[in-house]
Amino acid sequence: MPFIDIRLAAPCLPEKVSQIAARMTDLTVEILGKRREVTAAVVQCVAPGHWTIGGESLNLAGVGSFFLEVNVTEGTNTPAQKAAFVAAAFDAAEAILGRLDAASYAIVREIPAEAWGYQGRTQAARAGQRIGVAA
């Protein structure tokens, strides 16, 4: 049940927003092994002049940037999966948005199963139900 938060320092063109949300969802499914039907994504656009790296506006730098955070249940992905996701996310964002500053970030944030959920139930409760244990 990942939640993907994507912030772009780029013009907010509807086709780019759709492409980036779709591609990051695909990577979450393909690399992290998450279920597409419960993967949600939000894309926010920030004017490049409002995004700085090293104290310099991206307007002046002539490049774009992004911040991506995908929230997953703790312990459900290996270090290799997380590293592959971070690399693929940067490559995908650059393919869609054009040249990006190296300080463009992708984070796989692990949240304890008892600390989050969807449809009113924690992931721990869902796991307990699957194995027949009260959570």
Could you describe each region identified by the protein language model?
Residues 1-135:
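A domain-level signal for the structural core that forms small-molecule/cofactor-binding pockets
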